[in-house]
Amino acid sequence: CLISGSPGTGKTTAVARILAFLIESSSEATPLRIALAAPTAKAAIRLEEAISQIKQVLCSPDWVKNLIPEESWTIHRLLGSNADGTSYRHRESNPLPCDIVVVDEASMIDLPLMAHLLEAIPRSSRLILLGDPHQLSSIEAGAVLEDIMGPGEKNRYSLAFLKRFREYTGSDSLSPSEADESVMTDAMVELTRNYRIRDESILGRFKKSVVTGDAAETLHLLESGEESLSWLDLPDLHALKNYVRTEIGKYLNGYLKHVVKHSDNNELFASFDSFRVLCALRGGLFGTIHLNRLMEDFLKEKSGIHPSRPFYPGKALMVTNNDYALQLFNGDIGLVLADDRSKEPHSVCFREAKGAFRRLSPYTLPEHETAFAMTVHKSQGSEYERVFLFLPEADNPILNRELIYTGITRARRELTVCGRKDILIRAVSRKMERYSGLTEKIRQGQPVE
């Protein structure tokens, strides 16, 4: 089945309750084998954290909660990727030993990886996909989640399903489907109530205006003067530098205090993740490369560090190339810390599953880049209290409503959009279109090969 919804609608809570129900109602002599997975290590860690928190308040017997796993895998690790990531141990001839597979952030999965995953799941097993179809699709081929959702109506069900639902719950709250049945009929639900950001709040209304492509309403809300949503047009380099040193500098200073006082790793990562600078592009005045350089200059000056030093306490790094030997993957974030326990002055701390941390020499890392600013693509699967979203100086085909939506929904409490209004309007009016043929095959009930 597929559970869709924007961040904060309760997708993970819903799947935890589904797992508890399936475990408790199972007639199998042995416990159900359940696997949790996500496309990236960062998303897998967030899934673990969410499941762990939900289990603490789940109204189920302890023996049921104990059978809901907390360890989550990247899809590549779950499938048993080889050293270069081109083939997998688990496939049709050697399927996954799982009765249920739960995959979060499904919008990030490209078509080839989804094909490998489906091939490795036994036909008798259940697959539960969680995701937000309004977010950016994978950089690689396909828009799998959107294509899967395309053939069927959301939140409308067959008469047979409505009858079973009424018998089980006594409720007539669901609506009947008016479309022809497909293989996805009764297998999709869209969660619409947001428990984190109220629909009537300024951020909730702003999100809706972007999803629907209502550029006029998007602009109206940006100009409303609400504290949690602001707009800023920085006309030149001088204005940008000043903004980095003042407004963004407040958050950098707060993070730097934790670095200087050697806060424990949890506090340090929490401070770092309290804000993020997101960019549509890597290049240009408002791209990640330039903004990272400005923020690094600010931090080095504050810390008295020579501008030429590549590593220094507090530097944030993002892995950009998978290293299966080190178990580091594209998108993993590490923070450089002073290290008096080794011969080298610095080590890079990475957050891992179940609250664990791992330190590595910065000189052993695969390809990486500074990560105070990151692209919207790289931010998928993460959320921050405060987000600064930078648009480029000129219109670009990569700008579309999916990118804007993904960027703004990373913000939990406060959002600042930096850029020209006409650039934003064009982006919101532009919808990304991809064609893979998957929608038609699902609608017609054809096998997907």
Name each model feature, range by range.
Residues H134-L317, D323-L326:
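Conserved helicase motor core of P-loop NTPases
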Residues P122, P310-P313, F329, S379:
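Residue-level recognition of short, solvent-exposed, well-ordered loop/turn junctions
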Residues L36, L129, V277-C279, L389, ...:
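Structural beta-sheet core signal
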Residues P31-L32, C98, R123-R126, M184-M188, ...:
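Short glycine-/polar-rich loops that comprise or flank the Walker A/P-loop
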Residues C1-L221:
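ASCE P-loop NTPase helicase motor core
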